[in-house]
Structures are given as C-alpha cells and as structure tokens.
C-alpha cells in the first residue's frame, strides 16, 4: 500500500477488480478552497488503455510488485517468442499478443526487459533504439523527390519502415522502437 502523495511515474497500481495500471503522469493540486487532490493519467498494463483518474490526497492505494528482468530473445516457436533469462538461463515462452509491437524489432540475440507480475508476463520492453539490417529496399533515384526524400524498406525482421533515399539493401541502421522512425546509419 502506498499513499497517493507517494505516486511517481512508472509505479504500478492495482485498482478496480485487480487490474494493473501504470502511472504515466501525476499532478498534486491544492485548490484555494477544499481538500487537495492528485490528478493522474493511468495506463492499463495489459490493454494499453489510458484513463484520467483523480484521487483525494493522502488516500491509500494498492501497489503491485512488477518484476522486470533482462532477457535475451532466443527463437520463435510457432506463435510464441522464447526468451532466456540472462542470470538463471531459464527459458520463458511469451505469446505474440503479449510481445505486441516489440515483435517488429526482435532478432535472435536481442536483449529486452520482460515485466512479470505474480508469474504472468505483462509486457516486453525494448531499448529506445535498436540496430537492424535493411533486407530489401528499392534503389533511390536522384531526381525522385516527390515522396519527401524517403522510400519504403523491409528490415531483417520483416517490418517495413520509411528510410532516406540514400539507404541501400544490406546497410545497418538505427531504428526508434517506439515510433518505427529511421534514426541514422550505423558506422561499421
């Protein structure tokens, strides 16, 4: 249990029938009249739904213990991603639905943070940027500027992103895992 005065970004709360909500934003408000309160923006850990919720200041809320572990992606087994714990070398099978958009950037050997609560995997978190190889892209034509200087490219994971015209097949690039944006070339 924690007080609403102790809220901070990233804290996971157990509310409304045992659902887990992560604090995205919070603001302590002390109006001129009346009691103080805490205005929060909460994100459902499983569904990703974001809601605004207001708590009275000092009210006790139940916190959830979320165990985050660094794991290495090993291989795919049907619709499951198999991760290996970097400390114990135990393997963990995670359903594609739980992995979500992180699947677009997972290559064998990549490290990710796996969050669990009471043995259930909540989500897979990747670093903000990863380095991937361009598997296929059309050659960029010098005079072709009608598309704003970008062209589609397929990454080694099969995910498609837009890259600048000068990028060629086989090049290693840095990609933002949150937005799928091209960040730059990787110097060999």
Curated annotation (Swiss-Prot):
Q: Which HAMAP family match?
A: EF_P
- The leader peptide range reads none
This chain's source organism reads: Streptomyces coelicolor (strain ATCC BAA-471 / A3(2) / M145)
**Keyword flag Coiled coil:** no
Coiled-coil zones = none
Gene name in the database record: efp
Designated name of the protein: Elongation factor P
Which cellular component terms (GO) are annotated to the entry?
A: cytoplasm
Q: Which NCBIfam families match?
A: efp, PRK00529.1
Q: Which UniProt keywords apply?
A: Cytoplasm, Elongation factor, Protein biosynthesis
Task: Please name the Pfam families in this protein's record.
Answer: EFP, EFP_N, Elong-fact-P_C
Source superkingdom: Bacteria
Instruction: Give the protein family.
Output: Belongs to the elongation factor P family.
One of the record's GO molecular function terms: translation elongation factor activity
Pathway it works in? Protein biosynthesis; polypeptide chain elongation
């Amino acid at each position: 249990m924690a007080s609403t005065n102790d809220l901070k970004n990233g804290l996971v709360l157990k509310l409304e029938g045992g659902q887990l909500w992560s604090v995205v934003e919070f603001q302590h408000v002390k109006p001129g009249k009346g009691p103080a309160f805490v205005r929060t923006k909460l994100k459902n850990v499983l569904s990703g739904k974001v809601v605004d919720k207001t708590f009275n200041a000092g009210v006790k809320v139940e916190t959830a213990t979320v165990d985050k572990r660094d794991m290495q992606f090993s291989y795919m087994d049907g619709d499951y991603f198999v991760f290996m714990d970097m400390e114990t070398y135990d393997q963990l099978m995670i359903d594609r639905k739980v992995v979500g958009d992180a699947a677009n950037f997972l290559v064998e050997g990549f490290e990710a943070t796996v969050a669990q609560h009471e043995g259930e995997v909540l989500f897979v978190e990747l670093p903000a940027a990863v380095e991937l190889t361009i598997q296929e892209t059309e050659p960029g034509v010098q005079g072709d500027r009608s598309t704003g200087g970008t062209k589609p490219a397929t990454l080694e994971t099969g995910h498609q992103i837009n890259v600048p015209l000068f990028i060629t097949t086989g090049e290693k690039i840095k990609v933002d895992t949150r937005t799928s944006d091209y960040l730059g070339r990787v110097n060999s």
